[in-house]
């Protein structure tokens, strides 16, 4: 049996049968740092069509042969795939929902709301969007080491610290605790 994310497995919603194998996979989607030579490929934001992407794979139960078959199926299903990462089902739950939905989607949503706010306060929409998206690109490149050795300016670091103190709770990492991850999964399944 192939499932397309870890939620059902981690919520205990898969039948407990020892006579079948469970393989879990999910696309990483094309990275924001992915580069494709053709514009049409660059616009394949979800992946599984034209743009290359990585995938994550887990064998919940079964043999190594079952894993190999599952990965081969996943590579075809999500093609073009440039890399398959083998991780545990629990690690996949840390990635989704905790990292990419609960944390990243929330942060990106707040950023998009900030864009709407500066537009509401009079900044021309096109200028605000161009300014934000350009800065997001360089911020992501610095923070994710796409520009080795690059750092934020002193002023940018001061603004970052101020933002962390103003609207990020000190205990935000609790979303990665096993019980919290399970609560997230139960809430969405």
Where do the PLM segments sit?
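General structural feature for long, well-ordered alpha-helical segments within catalytic domains
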Residues: 66-70, 110, 128, 132-135
């Amino acid at each position: 049996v192939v499932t397309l994310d870890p939620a059902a497995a981690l919520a205990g919603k898969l039948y407990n049968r020892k006579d079948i194998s469970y393989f879990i996979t999910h696309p990483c989607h094309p990275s924001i740092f992915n580069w494709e030579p053709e514009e049409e490929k660059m616009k394949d934001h979800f992946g599984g069509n034209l743009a290359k992407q990585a995938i994550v794979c887990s064998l919940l139960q079964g043999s190594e042969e079952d894993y190999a078959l599952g990965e081969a199926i996943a590579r075809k299903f999500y093609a073009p795939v440039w890399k398959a990462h083998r991780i545990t089902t629990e690690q996949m739950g840390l990635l989704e929902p905790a990292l990419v939905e609960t944390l990243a989607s929330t942060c990106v949503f707040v950023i998009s709301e900030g864009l709407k706010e500066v537009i509401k306060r009079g900044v021309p929409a096109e200028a605000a969007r161009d300014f934000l998206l350009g800065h997001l690109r360089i911020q992501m490149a610095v923070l994710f080491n796409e520009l080795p050795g690059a750092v934020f300016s002193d002023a940018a670091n001061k603004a970052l610290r101020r933002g962390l103190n103003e609207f990020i709770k000190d205990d935000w990492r609790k979303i990665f605790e096993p019980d919290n991850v399970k609560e997230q999964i139960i809430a969405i399944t």
